[in-house]
Design a protein with these regions (language model features):
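C-terminal substrate-binding/catalytic lobe of Rossmann-fold NAD(P)-dependent oxidoreductases
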Residues: 68-196
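A generic structural signal for short
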Residues: 17-18, 82
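Rossmann-fold NAD(P)-binding glycine/threonine-rich loop
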Residues: 1-11, 18-43, 48-62
Length: 196
């Protein structure tokens, strides 16, 4: 994906990317956009509802940090053809929690036989206390379900998003492309939602 995005920017074509696994090189693409007057819009998920969940998730993590007494975990469910785990959406949710909840330093995916290279601890069983457990499930033709669960000794608080069909992903990508028209620089769904 990185090479394709770079080629688009070098050729003067605005790029809209929904792939993950390349954002460790985002700084290089930001510099290239500055040098070439290029434009890039990237998101781990183009569903507008998921992106609202990302914002809610960050805010909730900050509130839980102030209140204390809760642990957090994430579950993501996708169709059996999805090869990566955890999903980019689950990783984005985990990153939002790590940024706002003291004591969480990263995440661990406990799905046996499904791997993701970034920020993974090889482990089975329970997640270490300083990591967010991400459980990946692959079943049927599920387009995507993401659940963030905060649990204390006394209660459970969940936020959940279910994609009913993939049309919403295409719609979000079109909205992002329209937003990018006439712009230079690097943008994300936060920029789009901030200007909505």
């Amino acid at each position: 994906a990185y090479r394709n995005i770079r080629t688009c920017i070098e050729c003067g074509v605005a790029a809209v990317s929904g792939t993950t696994g390349w954002t460790d090189r985002l700084g290089e693409l930001q510099e290239l956009c500055r040098e070439r007057g290029g434009a890039l819009f990237y998101a781990s998920n183009y569903c507008l509802g998921v992106n609202l969940m990302f914002r809610l998730n960050r805010q909730l993590a900050a509130m839980i940090d102030r209140v204390g007494g809760y642990d957090v975990r994430i579950e993501e469910v996708h169709h059996t053809q999805k090869k990566d785990a955890p999903s980019g959406t689950a990783i984005t949710l985990a990153e939002g929690i790590v940024e706002n909840l003291a004591g969480k330093q990263g995440w661990v995916n406990l799905a046996p036989g499904i791997e993701h290279a970034a920020n993974r601890i090889e482990r089975s069983g329970e997640a270490p206390a300083d990591r967010i457990e991400i459980r990946s499930v692959r079943e049927g033709a599920v387009p995507g379900i993401h659940t963030v669960t905060y649990e204390s000794e006394d209660d459970v608080l969940e936020i959940r998003h279910t994609i009913k069909n993939r049309r919403t992903l295409a719609l979000g990508a079109v909205v992002a492309a329209e937003f990018l028209c006439g712009k230079q620089g690097v943008y994300s769904m936060d920029d789009l939602l901030r200007n909505a």
